[in-house]
Amino acid sequence: MSFYRSSIISQIIKYNRRLAKSIICEDDSQIITLTAFVNQCLWCHKRVSVSAILLTTDNKILVCNRRDSFLYSEIIRTRNMYRKKRLFLNYSNYLNKQERSILSSFFSLDPATADNDRINAIYPGGIPKRGENVPECLSREIKEEVNIDNSFVFIDTRFFIHGIIEDTIINKFFEVIFFVGRISLTSDQIIDTFKSNHEIKDLIFLDPNSGNGLQYEIAKYALDTAKLKCYGHRGCYYESLKKLTEDD
């Protein structure tokens, strides 16, 4: 794992008590360090995403299938043509079929790669807009990505989890704050109202009691942490996200 100087971890440690031991989970493209804290003082940071790990009424974990892979977004974003080509040729297995087809035409290259359709799973959330607090950010992102109104979402704000994500393919780091929550809908009801959009292709539902992969490991750590005593917290136990937005 490469060295990374977090933009907010020193402030988090200073004002929030550590709740659980840190863990590291990884796969072939990401290394994620997770640390849980009692929510005593948390604020929005313009460079840190806020995400929610949400359980449905039929006990499923809601995960989003990102439309564009992180690698594809990086290839499109970078202006360095050499870097574009290098990422495409070396890591095309980490693209989905449509992305490989688009980039093959763009570069007039046909890299030797498996004909797989890679899934990029993420939890709903994103970076707060200017002036947004945590509840407002979560409300907007969950509505935009999953089409769920905040009146159906309940967030446990007694604690939060700080994550440092190292993307070993594009060689970049990202920070995220996770909250645990519940949705007063079944997975089928969520699927019925979901509309594919420019960010999220479709939805995935995980079993919290069995599974594998990064998203399962993150959820397991979060749900295990939720069982701990959060002494000194300044949050709420599964408060309505709508009410949290109105209160703030």
Curated annotation (Swiss-Prot):
| Keywords from the named record | Host mitochondrion, Hydrolase, Magnesium, Manganese, Metal-binding
**What superkingdom heads the lineage?**
Viruses
User: What is one term from the GO cellular component aspect held by the record?
Assistant: host cell mitochondrion
- Cofactor(s), by name: Mg(2+); Mn(2+)
Localization: Host mitochondrion
The protein's matches in Pfam families, at most eight in alphabetical order, are given as: NUDIX, VD10_N
Work out whether the entry's keyword set contains Transmembrane: no
Q: What residues does the Nudix hydrolase domain cover?
A: 45-227
- Subunit info? Interacts with the late transcription elongation factor VLTF-4/OPG110. Interacts with the late transcription factors VLTF-1.
Q: What does this protein do?
A: Acts with RNA polymerase to initiate transcription from late gene promoters.
Under what name is this protein listed? mRNA-decapping protein OPG122
Species annotation? Monkeypox virus
Gene this chain is encoded by: OPG122
